């Protein structure tokens, strides 16, 4: 107990810090098997190209989830590869929308992959707790699970992986963070 030397009032009791729910960053692990990956290859790296693509997808009522853009200056022509995920039922429609934009936007090709899953760890304060993403990636690497895309927010870290590894990844993350 820490007390004032100027009076006899009760002081403050100082004790060892106890663990609380705030210490538990990850509250859940999920696997979404209903995702598909779309990549637009060789999109000229110019203002407005990505906006045109995502506006067209939005007008077709296609929800886009994770987005990754890789810029390249190979051959002296700045281009980008744009990869994103959509719900599997929207994949065919997304492909048609993109093909309708190919001549206008000048990209090389579109590829799709339905054999992916999205594994997420969910909790409060992901950004304010260092090492959560590193631990997630280490757990997945130890299981031989390759990460294709990564997305982070204040409450969630998600990765796109091969669908065949989904259950194994989810179990390993559950064991690492929740048991």
Summary of predicted features, one role per range:
Residues 1-152, 156-179:
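C-terminal catalytic "cap/lid" subdomain
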